[in-house]
């Protein structure tokens, strides 16, 4: 077996917490394939780069010879995960959950080895719990302990409603670990409480508690909030190569390094070298291109990555896109013509309409004919004429976080 310290260093890369590291070392010393679990409720049909942070860690365990379980929460998806929310999350219908689950299976194989990945659905055991089983499960935790969760604590303090089924959700996710006899569970930092519930329920069931490994949440294209389809600040793993390339190139230079740390498979010393080169005068755009190509090659292929780079060069650099440009941040619904005016690209909305009719308005290099539509959410590069550019981040106004 590979030296445990070497394996541990590899597994720790990019993690936020390992609870506990001592337990993980003990399990690794047993020199057996560990059961490593990652669960996801199929609340939307697309998997985006934010999801791949934990999927990449699951892949790492897989490459080290461990058993990986991708758990699709078809049962819990109909309950609704309250993690990080400031209001009750609406549950999905059975039909929505199953439809989204099918697309999940296809997309995770862009990262995981289909021959070595076990896909399980938690309805297999949760639907059999029944009323008596659910009551026994609920008896393992108190309301006081549930209110230790930051999101519940904030909502309770703000007199915002918390539905009973939201207290049940962490117990259901924790019971998944009991049913699978998981050795390790992965999740984002917002899942820490749920992962620790799994440890406690395993102890109550007389099993060895799982190791909980949390990973940072990937900040989305807006540079502020976690990547989320509902916020429009995401890149889906099935998006066209040219779209992926353009979106990666739109992120800020500061955010680029966070993405390198969480998404790139490059050795850490290589990333440090790239950062040093930028600090010494290398154009960060060139380093961003390397990241864009790495991600496109992973989710498509190298040929697609090279083609996307060439298209970007033809579209932007030959069009004299500047390395630096004004940056703006707006929130809420905004008409494209208004956005162009507010960003200083046109003196009036009527001028925006006229410029578009003459083919002079572009978003990420693509011509836009109708500026009467709403501007897209997220971060995009807007161009009017040959020399006016602005990078604009349009945030969605949150109602449910």
From Swiss-Prot:
Report a single Gene Ontology molecular function.
Answer: tyrosine-tRNA ligase activity
Name the InterPro entries for this protein.
aa-tRNA-synth_I_CS, aa-tRNA-synth_Ic, Rossmann-like_a/b/a_fold, S4_RNA-bd, S4_RNA-bd_sf, Tyr-tRNA-ligase, Tyr-tRNA-ligase_bac-type, Tyr-tRNA-ligase_bac_2
In which compartments does the protein localize?
A: Cytoplasm
Some GO term, biological process aspect, for this entry: which one? tRNA aminoacylation
Motif, 'KMSKS' region: chain positions: 226-230
Reactions catalysed: tRNA(Tyr) + L-tyrosine + ATP = L-tyrosyl-tRNA(Tyr) + AMP + diphosphate + H(+)
Q: Does the keyword Amino-acid biosynthesis apply?
A: no
Pinpoint the S4 RNA-binding domain residues.
334-394
Keyword list (alphabetical) reads: Aminoacyl-tRNA synthetase, ATP-binding, Cytoplasm, Ligase, Nucleotide-binding, Protein biosynthesis, RNA-binding
Q: Which GO terms describe its cellular component?
A: cytosol
EC annotation?
A: 6.1.1.1
What highest taxon heads this organism's lineage? Bacteria
Signal peptide as annotated in the record? none
> Where can the motif 'HIGH' region be found?
42-51
Primary subcellular site in the record, as a coarse category: cytoplasm
Q: What class of enzyme is it?
A: ligase
The record's annotation in NCBIfam families points to: tyrS (TIGR00234)
Summarize the protein's role: Catalyzes the attachment of tyrosine to tRNA(Tyr) in a two-step reaction: tyrosine is first activated by ATP to form Tyr-AMP and then transferred to the acceptor end of tRNA(Tyr).
What subunit structure does UniProt give? Homodimer.
Give the protein's recorded name. Tyrosine--tRNA ligase
Organism of provenance: Haemophilus influenzae (strain ATCC 51907 / DSM 11121 / KW20 / Rd)
Q: Which gene encodes it?
A: tyrS
């Amino acid at each position: 077996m590979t030296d445990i310290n070497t394996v541990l260093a590899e597994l720790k890369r990019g993690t936020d917490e390992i609870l506990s590291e001592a337990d993980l070392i003990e399990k690794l010393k047993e020199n057996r394939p560990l059961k490593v679990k990652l669960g996801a409720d199929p609340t939307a049909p697309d998997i985006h780069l934010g999801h791949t942070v934990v999927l990449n860690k699951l892949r790492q365990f897989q490459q080290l010879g461990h058993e990986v379980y991708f758990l699709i929460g078809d049962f819990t998806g109909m309950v609704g995960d309250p993690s990080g929310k400031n209001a009750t999350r609406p549950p999905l219908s059975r039909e929505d959950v199953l439809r989204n689950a099918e697309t999940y299976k296809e997309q995770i194989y862009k990262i995981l080895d289909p021959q070595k990945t076990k896909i399980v659905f938690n309805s297999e055991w949760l639907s059999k719990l029944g009323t008596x089983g659910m009551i026994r499960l609920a008896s393992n935790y108190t309301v006081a302990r549930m209110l230790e969760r930051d999101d519940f604590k904030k909502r309770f303090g703000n007199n915002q409603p918390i539905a009973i089924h939201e207290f049940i959700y962490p117990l259901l996710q924790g019971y998944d670990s009991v049913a699978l006899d998981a050795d390790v569970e992965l999740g984002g930092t917002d899942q820490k409480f749920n992962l620790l519930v799994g440890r406690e329920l395993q102890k109550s069931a007389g099993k060895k508690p799982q190791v909980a490994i949390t990973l940072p949440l990937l900040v989305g294209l807006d540079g502020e909030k976690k990547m989320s389809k509902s916020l429009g600040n995401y890149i889906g793993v099935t998006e066209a190569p040219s779209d992926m390339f353009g979106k990666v190139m739109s992120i800020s230079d500061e955010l680029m390094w966070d993405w390198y740390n969480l998404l790139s498979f490059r050795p850490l010393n290589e990333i440090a070298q790239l950062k040093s080169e930028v600090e010494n005068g290398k154009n960060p755009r060139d380093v961003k291109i390397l990241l864009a190509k790495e991600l496109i090659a992973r989710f498509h292929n190298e040929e697609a990555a090279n083609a996307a780079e060439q298209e970007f060069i033809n579209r932007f650099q030959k069009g004299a896109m500047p390395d630096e440009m004004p940056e703006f941040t707006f929130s809420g619904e905004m008409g494209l013509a208004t956005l162009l005016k507010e960003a200083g690209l046109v003196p009036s909305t009527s001028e925006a309409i006229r410029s578009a009719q003459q083919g002079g308005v572009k978003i990420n290099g693509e011509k836009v004919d109708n500026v009467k539509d709403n501007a897209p959410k997220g971060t995009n590069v807007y161009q009017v004429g040959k020399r006016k550019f602005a990078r604009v981040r349009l945030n969605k106004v949150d109602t449910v976080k």
